[in-house]
Every structure is written in C-alpha cells, then in structure tokens.
Regions:
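Short, charged, solvent-exposed linker or helix-capping segments at domain edges/interfaces
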Residues: 53-63, 112, 180, 201-208
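ATP-binding N-lobe of GHMP and related small-molecule kinases
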Residues: 2-110, 128, 132-136
Length: 230
C-alpha cells in the first residue's frame, strides 16, 4: 500500500465506533455460530496525531466505565490493544500517536462477546481513520487478533456476530468466509448474567478442557443438531 493512501494532514483525527454484544456456539455450533445482540454495546474512540519521529510505543489505552475496571490496559492483555498493535505493525503506522478510549458496557467474562466488541470497534475505527480500505473479511481477521488476549487463540464466532449482526455462520476452511442469515423479526433472546465473580482468562481455560477428539457417533449427532438450528 502506498503511503499517501493513509497520509493525514490535520493535526489530529478522531473516530468513534460502537459494536454490539453477541452470543456464540448456540449449543452445537462451537466456533461456527455467532449471533448479534442489541442489548449492550462497547464504544471505542480513537484519536491519532501525526509525529515527526517514529516510535513503536505509540499506543495508549484508557478504560472507562464500571465494566472496564478489571480489564488491563497494556496492549498484549487487551483485545483492542492486540488489534491496534497488529494493524499498526502491518501498515507501518508508527509515525502516529494513537489514544484508544474504551467505554466498556458489556460485562467481561460472561459469554456476551465483551472482548470481541472492543476488538471489532477498534478495527473499524482504525480502518476509517487511516483510510486503509480493508475489506470485511480481512477486517474480521484483524478483529480476531483481539481474542488472543482473552482466549489465547483466534476465533471468529463472537467477532462475526458483533460485526455483522443477526445470525452468522463462520467457515474457516479452505478460506475464511462468513454467511449472514437475517434473524426472524419475532425472535426474542433472554440474557441472564449471573452475579458471581468469574476468573481471569476464563475463556482460555474453558477451551483447554474441551477434548481434542470425539467419537464419530457424537460428531454425527452434533452435525445434525447444528443443521437443525439453521
């Protein structure tokens, strides 16, 4: 990409994006099904300012809101930070100071795609600010970098639900692909958030206890159940 495509002449630019909560798996659709929710949103505001000397320590994160108090603001432990770090590295955007302010409204650790929402809003904001013209598939791939902070691996189900809304099927082989299905107008979701503390990195721990191999019979049952959902 040529530098002039994302050259910024103003003293600073700012962009704000919101991304919705989501739920994923929906029973048999592990890492495949995502569903956008309209109950809560994270808001990410990013301000970039041109500087004369390149510096790789050019990103600062500020967490706001009660839901953000337990979330670290260092880049490698924050989903928005992971996304920003990857995009800035890939496009060599070290000549800009980048301030990321996250208004966290989605409770982390309760299966509502809290990390995914912040990651999606960050990717969308950076794409707009720098005029990178990243397509949707690649934008979601960047957003999934944020899941490394909470899950230890890239997965796309919550990311897709937050980005596209409605019901989304994720295909990762042979290429990353998303199939969006409009949800019925009369579909109602009941969200219950238990008032109990959850451990840090809960998602990463939960994924580690899932068996790596399952009997063929169980796989067939699961595929049938997944097809029934669709």
């Amino acid at each position: 990409m040529k530098k002039e495509r994302y050259e910024i002449v103003a003293e600073y630019l700012e962009c704000t994006a919101t991304a919705s909560a989501s739920t994923a798996n929906l029973g048999p659709g592990y890492d495949v099904f995502g569903l956008g929710l309209d109950v809560l949103q994270d808001t990410v505001s990013i301000r970039i300012e041109r500087k004369t000397i390149a510096n790789k320590n050019n990103v600062k994160i500020i967490m706001k809101g009660d839901m953000g108090k337990s979330i670290p603001n260092d880049l490698d432990s924050n989903s928005a930070g992971k996304v920003a770090k990857k995009i800035i590295s890939d496009y060599n955007l070290y000549n800009y100071n980048c301030l990321i302010e996250i208004r966290k409204n989605i409770p982390p650790g309760y299966g509502m795609g809290s990390s995914a929402a912040s990651a999606v809003a960050t990717a969308v904001s950076l794409n707009a600010l720098f005029g990178l013209n990243i397509d949707d598939t690649k934008l979601l791939d960047y957003s999934a970098e944020g899941e490394l902070a909470s899950a230890g691996v890239k997965h796309f189900d919550n990311i897709a639900g937050s980005f596209f809304g409605n019901f989304v099927i994720v295909k990762t082989y042979p290429n990353l692909e998303f199939i969006r299905i409009e949800s019925p107008n009369n579909l109602t979701m009941v969200i219950c958030v238990p008032l109990i503390p959850v451990p840090k990195m809960k998602t990463e721990f939960s994924r580690k206890v899932i068996p790596q191999q399952v009997p063929l019979e169980k796989m067939v049952h699961n595929v049938a159940n997944a097809c029934s959902v669709v």
